[in-house]
Amino acid sequence: IDQWTAFPGLYGYLQIRGGIRNMWMTDNMYVEKAMIHHKWIGGKIGGKFPVNLSYEFHHVAQWGGFSPVYGDLGNNWNAFLNALFVRSGGSMATDQINAQGNHIGSQILTLDIKGNKWKVSAYWQNISEDGPIKFIGFGMNTPDGLWGINITQQHWPFISGLTYEFVQTTDQSGPFHDKDGFVFGGNDSYYTNSIYQNGWNYWYRTIGTPF
């Protein structure tokens, strides 16, 4: 369900959307024949009111493929289920301790205000590289994220909209990774991975927000 769809019986005041995609990466730059899993779900309240509030959660994972160092990274049904449910698995120690594959969670909180021939959208996006994932604003890396505002209008023909965004990635849940063995996180080094060293790019083009 790519578009916001009214929840039955609530007259459009509650809308939902979500889906699941599974893709293959064909560039074969470092890990050959790696795969991408993406699922998302979201809800919006407000409907015909001038103010709407929406929340979305996205989970994306790189998994499978063949590494020049580690060989087969798991390309069977069980490996897919590990990626789908963020479970540990595989033959490598990092995948046994954490989760099989390279996982990212993203949360998006959006406030929409609509008027006569104009609309203002203010949004906040937060990324999670480590678990446990908490609601946006309560995680270990709350200072990091993308904040934006988008204004569209139909009054004047010479401009249709204006967007401003601010990105911060310096907190990274603190400088140390798993310093006590109980609180997992820190030194997130977003978009990098020791196994999938080509990172989140496809044919040398960044997937997602560039830094």
Functional labels for PLM-detected ranges:
Residues W4-R17, I45-S54, I113-K119, Q153-I159:
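Short loop/turn motifs that connect adjacent beta-strands in outer-membrane beta-barrel proteins
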Residues F7, R21-M29, Q62, I127-I133, ...:
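Sequence/structural signature of outer-membrane beta-barrel proteins
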Residues I16-W24, V86-M92, Q125-E129, T209-P210:
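Flexible, solvent-exposed coil segments and beta strand-coil junctions
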Residues G18-W24, L53-H59, A122-N126, L162-Q168:
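Transmembrane beta-barrel strands of outer-membrane/channel proteins
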Residues M25, H37, G43, G47-K114:
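A conserved mid-domain beta-alpha-beta active-site/ligand-binding segment of alpha/beta enzyme cores
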Residues N28-I36, F66-Y70, P132-G137, G174-K179:
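Outer-membrane beta-barrel translocator domains and adjoining extracellular loop/strand segments
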Residues M35-H58, G145-W156, T163-Q168:
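Transmembrane beta-barrel strand/turn architecture of Gram-negative outer membrane proteins
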Residues D95-S106, K114-F211:
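Outer-membrane beta-barrel pore domains
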